[in-house]
Amino acid sequence: MKNILKILILILICINKINCLDGDGKQFRMIMLLSANVNDMGFNNMMNQGRIGVSKNLQIEDSRLIVVDGENDTKALVEPILQNEDIDFVICSSQGHTVACKYFADKYLKHPTVKTQFLIRGSGSSTANLIQFNYNFASCNYMSGYFAGLHTKTNKIGFLSPGAPKVNDAWVYAFWLGAKQVNPKIQFFYYNVGAFLNPDASERATNDLLERGCDVIGNTLDDFSSGITIMSKGYRTIGTNGFPQKLIYGEKILYSYAYNWTKLFLPIAMSVKAGITNNTNGYGDFNLDESKNFFNIEYSYGVSTDTINRMNQQITFLKSNSRFTHPYYCNEYLPEYTKKNNLNLSTSPTVNNLICIDHSTFLKINPPFPGMTYLGIYNISLVEVEFSQSIQNGFSITTGILIGITILMMIGIIKYSKTPSMRSASPIFLNFILAGGIIVYIGIIVWVGPMSTHSCNARLWLVTLGFSTLIGSLVVKNFRIWLIFDNPELKSIKITNYQLFPWVGACLVINIILMAILTSVGDLKQIDAMNIDSLGKYEYMKVCKMNSSGASTLYTILAYFAALLLVGVFVSWKIRIVDILEFNESGAIANTLYAISFCLFVIVPLMISPQDMQSETIILCTTGLFITTAALLIIFIPKFWRVFRKGANDSEINFNKKKSSSVATARAESGSKGSNGNASSGNRTNRRGNVVSGDFTDDSESSVGDENQKEKEKIKDDVANVTSGAVLAEFTDEASDTDNNEFNDIELSEQPPSIIVNDSENNN
């Protein structure tokens, strides 16, 4: 008994294998091409259901699904498969595959090895390897409109279609006619959305139709985005894309029709598997023979019995009559419409002498009939996402306040320019530094302002020129201090402001040249950017963009600023030996560079990490404000504080001496030895040598035990008094006896007693 069961199982397995083979005894291979993914819950999903149904009925193991659309993409993807694999049957489901599949059929019609047969959308003649199929899309849309006319409560219905050039609006006309036949009072509105699959446009267009009062909305789209939008508003809807929506959404679907592609594809696939090349086309429609009936109709419990009965009566009428005499081909509106739009009426005789059009003329219907309200192509308007107005106002107000403070500082410098604290720092260069800060502030206001090509260029020009002016003036004026005080030979040096102006100008000229290159070759302009940051699909933001040449130039500008900062570091390090606080700005420069370095330490990781444009702008502008404001405060607060502490009317050249550096001491000692020569030179020495040795060193430590120490200290202080006044004159370019910095040896007793040098360690 067990042996008999084993034999029966083997026989069944063999029969199953034989059924999977075609007439030549090889495995049957089938491919279906889809224009979109099967999860559209519409046309493509139902096509795939047809493939599955054929595969089950014919027990096809190698049944593939390929998503591709368009002639070129279809050729590129499918042809290698045809050449390298023995494919028997290809179903080209979409009109986007038609041209490519016809090309394959013609190319391989008499090919010795490629015996593939192709099933394409159309109604033309068949060949040995080309079969065409179609379905009556007019009849299902006519019946959907018929239902809409029966069910509407507002007498307003709507429709969505792809529209030309994808497809003419003949199907829209069929829907409208169905409603018009049963409800002459109907008002009809429709949109084109540009494609069979455009959920964004269909959702927005559906909302518009709902706002117009439409309570039933149909469509000829591939997906169910319109129906989902309607249900999200709390309404029930109809399913008009060939998918049995009631299976998913239940009683929210008032009415739907579903395609049964298995009934259409199965006879054709059986013929191909049997090796028959005398092919005939396939067509899907309402049919009295249920095995051939292509459409399955379903209703919700909310639909009245009267509506269902009238629907069934009309469907029976369509099944019982030739489709060429159906109402959408033959009605009283056609004569006037065809005449107006240069279309032809059918000349074929019909029953009861009906006035009709043929199918080719039907497909040319596109302009609306009287009573159809065409709302046009629904274009989704792009929405600009603007920079936050509150942030923009915050930056602008803050920067405006800082500009006002900076202007007050400039006025203060002019007012107190005669005070030692200001005179020693070169007032004209102080104002240059402040002017550079104002330019940077203006650039930041432009940076957060409305975006345009002009503002994209202006903000870079302003910010770079501002920093060049600020940093360049700071470096150049302190370069003069270094040259005067870092003087091992203790020679008299005169450097006027007019001699320094070209150096500041050179810093600006370099900046201008680099920015001119960026402007000319960088193609810096404002563009409307989409798909950036967290923007929606139909949102855009105005941003500044430059090409690679512009980016390279910008990096060069940044390198130039880095070099300028390095020079500033060098100068600040060199002037650290200056013992007079008014002339020593090494601390201010160092603190400014520290602030810049701190910002770079924070900003670089932030800029490298993903940032949206608004966050990037906030970071850059905040950094620019901080660097500029910190630099100005670090440089100018001590100066104004000294003016406040000493008094605005202080006429004394009252310098503060800080603790001497070891470098200054060493240089002073070297200078003293070179200038004294021997003991006989006594008290007559170079005055600048004396001031360096006396004011910039701590000689009390090196001369302990000298019985004349107190007298020497007095002599050095007196010499320092005269030379300090001379040095101050060099920084102000004022006409005086010391402007040329050339001093004759005079007796110490001749020094003016009003010039005082204070030791900062003993003077608070």
UniProtKB/Swiss-Prot annotation:
GO terms, biological process: G protein-coupled chemorepellent receptor signaling pathway; G protein-coupled receptor signaling pathway; response to bacterium
Feature: compositional bias, Low complexity: 671-690
Descriptive protein name: Metabotropic glutamate receptor-like protein H
Organism: Dictyostelium discoideum
GO MF: G protein-coupled chemorepellent receptor activity; G protein-coupled receptor activity
Domain of life: Eukaryota
Ranges of Acidic residues composition bias in the record: 731-748
Cytoplasmic side: 415-427, 486-500, 574-587, 639-764
Topology relative to the membrane: Multi-pass membrane protein
Region Disordered, residue ranges: 664-764
InterPro entries recorded: GPCR_3_C (IPR017978), mGluR/GABA-B-like (IPR051530), PnrA-like (IPR003760)
Membrane is among the record's keywords: yes
Biased segments, Basic and acidic residues type: 707-719
Organism classification: Eukaryota, Amoebozoa, Evosea, Eumycetozoa, Dictyostelia
Keywords assigned: G-protein coupled receptor, Glycoprotein, Membrane, Receptor, Signal, Transducer, Transmembrane, Transmembrane helix
Main location: membrane
Glycan-bearing residues: N72, N260, N278, N344, N379, N547
Coiled coil: none
UniProt cross-references to CDD domains, sorted A to Z: 7tmC_GABA-B-like
A GO CC term assigned to this protein in UniProt: plasma membrane
Entry's localization field: Membrane
PANTHER family according to UniProt: METABOTROPIC GLUTAMATE RECEPTOR-LIKE PROTEIN C-RELATED, METABOTROPIC GLUTAMATE RECEPTOR-LIKE PROTEIN C-RELATED-RELATED
Transmembrane segments: 394-414, 428-448, 465-485, 501-521, 553-573, 588-608, 618-638
Record has Transmembrane helix as a keyword: yes
Induction description: Down-regulated by phagocytic stimuli.
Gene that this sequence comes from: grlH
Extracellular domain ranges by topology: 21-393, 449-464, 522-552, 609-617
